[in-house]
Amino acid sequence: MPVKIPDNLPAAEILESENIFVMSETRAANQDIRPMRVLILNLMPNKIETETQLLRLLGNTPLQVDVDLLRIHDKESKHTSIDHMNNFYRDFEQVRNKNYDGLIITGAPLGQIEFEDVSYWDHIREIIDWSQQHVTSVLFLCWAAHAALYHLYGLNRSLLTSKRSGVFAHQRTREHFPLLRGFDDEFYAPHSRFAEMDIEQLRSHPELQVLTESDEAGAYMVLSRSNRNLFVMGHPEYQKSTLKDEYERDLSQGLSPEIPQNYFGNDDPTQQPIARWHSHGSLLVSNWLNYYVYQLTPYNLDDMSGRTPWESAVL
């Protein structure tokens, strides 16, 4: 959150040059504050686990956040009771005419299926298109990031010969981006996917900016130049045991998965996992919610169709 300082304080220029978020008394006095409204489209099989992971990150920010949960269809989920879905989730028709400050679209275990062959692909495209007019900023995670890059920019992924699973080191490729404030020069994040985007296509696209990447895992955080869409190719929301649970699930199904890299102690699956990414995940979501949602969204969400703060904002 910003530090409020007197108007024309000499330190302001220095602090701003160091990428410290400060706000003058005049600007602070004219700020209207209300809870942020965030919609979560949960595509993961275990709905409750994913809800908990994302709400944990949202709850770690200093902002009040009102969350709505969205399902892609009303078909019964294999891993979540129909009572839970009916009690806590909304259908798209219930939110179609609403506006939100933020939208999070999760990953999905669909990495080896062509986008057009996904049973609800048309629904995904419809929601992505809707979000570009009804949401200030959208955070796409893993499969959703690949799907959105394909739908919005025509950039397709390449399938991998084996699942990329593990915790990988990443580096910043840009400086002085609000989204990267507080990031270490090198940080870790989990990946669990069967596909990868071509990093050179991402780097050369005029509407996209690669902010962080990994020598082992490729592009990680990509931001649209409009500031509206953030594509995160991994799973910063994962809890400590998630990769372990996925690995053991695949073993039980006879899939012969590779051991997640840089995850178990000494890369030995009989040892406990080592969580190296929780502080990064918390900071990523906090920065997104603060700088790309809270700072850009209109106070009256009904005004969203009449203004585009993300296109004129200088962050």
Swiss-Prot record:
Its EC number is 2.3.1.46. The active site is at C142, H235, E237. The keyword Iron does not apply. It holds the Pfam family HTS. One of its GO terms (cellular component) is cytoplasm. One of its GO terms (molecular function) is homoserine O-acetyltransferase activity. GO terms for biological process: L-methionine biosynthetic process from homoserine via O-succinyl-L-homoserine and cystathionine. It is found in: Cytoplasm. It is an enzyme of class 2 (transferase). The keyword Transcription does not apply. The record marks G111 as: Important for acyl-CoA specificity. Keywords: Acyltransferase, Amino-acid biosynthesis, Cytoplasm, Methionine biosynthesis, Transferase. The record marks S192 as: Important for substrate specificity. It catalyses: L-homoserine + succinyl-CoA = O-succinyl-L-homoserine + CoA. Pathway: Amino-acid biosynthesis; L-methionine biosynthesis via de novo pathway; O-succinyl-L-homoserine from L-homoserine: step 1/1. HAMAP family: MetA_acyltransf. Transfers a succinyl group from succinyl-CoA to L-homoserine, forming succinyl-L-homoserine. Belongs to the MetA family. This is Homoserine O-succinyltransferase. It comes from Shewanella piezotolerans (strain WP3 / JCM 13877). The lineage of its organism: Bacteria, Pseudomonadati, Pseudomonadota, Gammaproteobacteria, Alteromonadales. The gene is metAS.
